[in-house]
Amino acid sequence: MLTINASPNAPAANSQLMGGFWSGVSQLSTGKKRGAIGQAQMQLVQQLLAAELNASAFGSIPATGSFAAWESAFCGTNANAVKNAQQQAASFNSQGDNSTFTPGTSADSKFARFIANLLFWDKYTN
């Protein structure tokens, strides 16, 4: 389970969830380069987090793949499995691109970046 505290007075770097979205794919927060599998894992985690949120918000389920399979690929070291999971999650996330839904509030990218815990995702370095 990932942490998120998005209250208006939330402390900096408290949100592991936002850290997943804002962490660099090719580099760690320290500037060190991620390896090929680490980069693929970070591409997957951004799609996977979005997919989990989309499923929760809209009640949708993937047509191909599954959250369990994508999470398993993320935790593994098979680059092809990670890339396949990323493609499936990205496809799932784009299924509703042409749908109409009631908009919520505007996003606040500055605050989202402020609360993002980037260090949490530095462990994916391979």
Annotate each predicted stretch with a short phrase.
Residues 1-126:
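Soluble extracellular-acting proteins and domains
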